[in-house]
């Protein structure tokens, strides 16, 4: 996994060199677009063998659909102008990762402070709790055991390298 100015690039393992090069070029074009609007950032990007480019963006205050459309149009134009796909044989999808996708970047954790998380650890054990704080190397999770008067809440400091996945839990 490459990290570039807040952009996470996760290429498929069977990519050929030109696909990797295209992915890096598109990431560079996207970085330039995102530098104009620093409240938004790239979470993930991939290119399918059919030249279907999928870009997953997020924002510190969320990502409105209108912004997805705006980024899609601008990035599509930049890709066309770059000549990466001279025959125009590509498609582009720009969207948010979705609520069921695991958090990947520290910025995502920070924007979800105060929300319930479901964390799977490297050993496949699980904890749920409220995200209270985020630092460079770890998070603080308020984990409650028991119910009612017997409920006990403890603050767990969890290093990022112990987290296999963390997803936001939507409570209704």
Language-model-detected regions and their locations in the chain:
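Helix-adjacent hinge/juxtasegments
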Residues: 66-69, 73-106
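Short secondary-structure junctions
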Residues: 31-41, 83-87
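Conserved RNA-binding domains used in RNP assembly and mRNA/RNA metabolism
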Residues: 80, 117, 121-128, 132-172
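Short, charge-patterned binding micro-sites
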Residues: 43-62, 85-100
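N-terminal presequence-like segments and adjacent domain-start helices
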Residues: 1-27
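A short linear hydrophobic-aromatic micro-motif
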Residues: 39-45, 128
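Ordered, soluble secondary-structure elements with a strong preference for glycine-centered loop motifs
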Residues: 20-24, 62-69
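Short boundary/loop segments of OB/S1/cold-shock single-stranded nucleic-acid-binding domains
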Residues: 101-122
């Amino acid at each position: 996994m490459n990290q570039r100015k807040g952009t996470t690039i996760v290429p498929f393992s069977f990519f050929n060199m030109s696909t990797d090069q295209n992915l890096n070029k598109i990431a560079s074009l996207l970085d330039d677009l995102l530098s104009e609007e620093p409240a938004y950032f790239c979470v993930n990007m991939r290119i399918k063998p059919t030249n279907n480019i999928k870009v997953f963006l997020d924002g510190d205050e969320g990502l409105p659909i209108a912004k997805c459309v705006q980024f899609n149009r601008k990035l599509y134009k930049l890709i066309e102008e770059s000549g990466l796909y001279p025959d125009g044989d590509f498609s582009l999808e720009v969207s948010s990762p979705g609520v069921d996708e695991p958090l990947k970047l520290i910025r995502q954790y920070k924007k979800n402070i105060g929300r319930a998380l479901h964390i799977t650890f490297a050993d496949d054990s699980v904890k749920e709790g409220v995200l209270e704080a985020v630092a460079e190397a770890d998070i603080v999770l308020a984990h409650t055991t028991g119910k009612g008067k017997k409920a006990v809440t403890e603050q767990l400091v969890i290093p990022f390298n112990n987290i296999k996945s963390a997803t936001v839990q939507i409570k209704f």
